[in-house]
Amino acid sequence: MEKMLLKSTTRHVRIFTAEVVDEELKFHPNKLTLDLDPDNEFIWNEDSLNKINEKFNELIKERAGKDLDDYELRKIGSEIEGLIKFLLQNGQLSYNPDCRVMNYSMGLPKTNEVL
């Protein structure tokens, strides 16, 4: 029986047991592909992207030798979501005012002014 492509989807993180070939996802049992912020809700800089990629690689290494089932993928996705929120709360990431829908899914931006 051929294995199926697994995925974990959160609001800002999508993880697939696949690799990108000719702009298409192709199942691969030993590779994960990260699709970060598919709705462009945030403005990303190199530093914040590097932190996300480092954390993603760290989480994968921690699971070396384990089956990458949907539960493990969800745990990885949840940890990446937590890092996104941390970066946002610490001013290392900001909301994109040009995104399709401005809903502040990770909380209202912090300002010095009283709302």
From Swiss-Prot:
One of its GO terms (molecular function) is oxidoreductase activity, acting on NAD(P)H, quinone or similar compound as acceptor. NDH-1 shuttles electrons from an unknown electron donor, via FMN and iron-sulfur (Fe-S) centers, to quinones in the respiratory and/or the photosynthetic chain. The immediate electron acceptor for the enzyme in this species is believed to be plastoquinone. Couples the redox reaction to proton translocation, and thus conserves the redox energy in a proton gradient. Cyanobacterial NDH-1 also plays a role in inorganic carbon-concentration. Keywords: Membrane, NAD, NADP, Plastoquinone, Quinone, Thylakoid, Translocase, Transport. It comes from the Bacteria. Its EC number is 7.1.1.-. Disulfide bonds: none annotated. This is NAD(P)H-quinone oxidoreductase subunit M. InterPro entries: NdhM. It is an enzyme of class 7 (translocase). NDH-1 can be composed of about 15 different subunits; different subcomplexes with different compositions have been identified which probably have different functions. Its main location: membrane. Belongs to the complex I NdhM subunit family. PANTHER family: NAD(P)H-QUINONE OXIDOREDUCTASE SUBUNIT M, CHLOROPLASTIC (PTHR36900:SF1). The lineage of its organism: Bacteria, Bacillati, Cyanobacteriota, Cyanophyceae, Synechococcales. GO terms for cellular component: plasma membrane-derived thylakoid membrane. It is a peripheral membrane protein. The keyword RNA-binding does not apply. It catalyses: a plastoquinone + NADH + (n+1) H(+)(in) = a plastoquinol + NAD(+) + n H(+)(out); a plastoquinone + NADPH + (n+1) H(+)(in) = a plastoquinol + NADP(+) + n H(+)(out). It comes from Prochlorococcus marinus (strain AS9601). It is found in: Cellular thylakoid membrane. Pfam families: NdhM.
